[in-house]
Each structure stands twice: as structure tokens, then as C-alpha cells.
């Protein structure tokens, strides 16, 4: 029936078909194959670097032509169909409110020379004060100076205005200097 030669040919073809030596493109198992990814040739499917800048120049010139044509046709559109410029106007109005306790005139005399700010603890000459507040704070008003401040010194930076408590504002100038008030326990009359 079968000849040994035919049997030998069929067995050789089966061995060659199942061998790892002959691979089809779809049957490669990559790193799980017997070769275990030891392929030192160029990476298949990777694009090679094209050094020719002539193609890049041509593509760049085509883009410039397209942009120029787009601008030309955009400028030919009616004004109503063109996109508006981005709005530059201020949509929120800022209302300036000065800080409490400060006047607008105070801002004018804060610094004459803005570039120079003295270090802390340094005093400037009288013709160029650090701030007007220094001049105003360290020279007390003569109205606020009382004779009793000699005996009592308030904390630094404070001025003391001695006024009596509410209901105790008495004017001693209106009373006579020789007035004598006496109460007697035995109902005697005073002179």
C-alpha cells in the first residue's frame, strides 16, 4: 500500500511544518519563543529617521500657503460675519474706598522719595522724615499736655488726656475760695 519512500516524505514534511526553525509571520510568539527575543536586527515596523529636510520644507511652505489663503478669504468676508476682537473693556468697575481712619490727603504726603525706605531703628534728618506720622506722633499737642502728666507717664506711644469721669466735670473756678462747709452732729448752726 504505502511505500516507505512516501511515508518518509510525509513524515519529513510534518516535522518541518511543526518545527520552530521555520516561522510564519503570524505564528511568532515574541519573547515566549525559544529564541526569547534575541533579535539584534532593526526593529520591525519602526519608522526610520528621515534626515532629508527638503520634505519638511515643502510641508512648511504648504502650511504657510494654506494660512495665507485662509487669511485672504477671511478678510473678504463681510464685517458682520467676522469674529469680534476680544473685549478689552473692563466689565467690573472698581470703586475705591479708603481705609477707615485715613483721608485722601494723607496719601499725598506719605513718602516724598519712594525709592528710599530707611531701615528700622534708623532716624532720618528732619528735612526728610521717614513718614509724616513720625512727626505727628512724637510731638504732642499742647492742648493734650496736662500738669498732671509730670506725675504719671502713660505707656510708650500713648498720650494721656486727664478728664474726670462722667458726672464729675466740675469747674472749681466758679466757687469762692473761702467757702467752708461744715456739718454738725449736734445741730449747731455754723457761722
From Swiss-Prot:
Family annotation (InterPro entries): PBAN, Pyrokinin_CS
Domain of life: Eukaryota
GO BP terms, alphabetized: neuropeptide signaling pathway; pheromone biosynthetic process
Principal location class: secreted
Tissue: Expressed in the subesophageal ganglion.
Keyword field contains Secreted: yes
Example of a GO MF term: neuropeptide hormone activity
Cellular location(s): Secreted
A GO cellular component annotation in the UniProt record: extracellular region
Positions of the propeptide removed during maturation: 48-91, 169-191
PROSITE patterns listed in its UniProt record: PYROKININ
Keyword tags: Amidation, Cleavage on pair of basic residues, Hormone, Neuropeptide, Secreted, Signal
Residues spanning the signal sequence: 1-17
Residues modified to Leucine amide: 44, 100, 120, 156, 166
Family assignment from sequence similarity: Belongs to the pyrokinin family.
Main function: A hormone that controls sex pheromone production in females and pheromone responsiveness in male.
Protein known as: PBAN-type neuropeptides
Organism, as annotated: Spodoptera littoralis (Egyptian cotton leafworm)
Taxonomic classification: Eukaryota, Metazoa, Ecdysozoa, Arthropoda, Hexapoda
Amino acid at each position: 500500500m504505502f511505500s516507505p519512500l512516501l511515508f518518509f516524505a510525509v513524515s519529513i514534511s510534518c516535522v518541518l511544518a511543526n518545527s520552530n526553525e521555520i516561522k510564519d509571520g503570524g505564528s511568532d510568539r515574541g519573547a515566549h519563543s525559544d529564541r526569547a527575543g534575541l533579535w539584534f536586527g532593526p526593529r520591525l515596523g519602526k519608522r526610520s529617521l528621515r534626515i532629508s529636510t527638503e520634505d519638511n520644507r515643502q510641508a512648511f511652505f504648504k502650511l504657510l500657503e494654506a494660512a495665507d489663503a485662509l487669511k485672504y478669504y477671511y478678510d473678504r468676508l463681510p464685517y458682520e460675519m467676522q469674529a469680534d476682537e476680544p473685549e478689552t473693556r473692563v466689565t467690573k468697575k472698581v470703586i475705591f474706598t479708603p481705609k477707615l481712619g485715613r483721608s485722601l490727603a494723607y496719601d499725598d504726603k506719605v513718602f516724598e522719595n519712594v525709592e528710599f525706605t530707611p531701615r528700622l531703628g534708623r532716624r532720618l534728618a528732619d528735612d526728610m522724615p521717614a513718614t509724616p506720622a513720625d512727626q505727628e506722633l512724637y510731638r504732642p499737642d499742647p492742648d493734650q499736655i496736662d500738669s498732671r502728666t509730670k506725675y504719671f507717664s502713660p505707656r510708650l506711644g500713648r498720650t494721656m488726656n486727664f478728664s474726670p469721669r462722667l458726672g464729675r466735670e466740675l469747674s472749681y473756678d466758679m466757687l469762692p475760695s473761702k467757702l467752708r462747709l461744715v456739718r454738725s452732729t449736734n445741730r449747731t448752726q455754723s457761722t
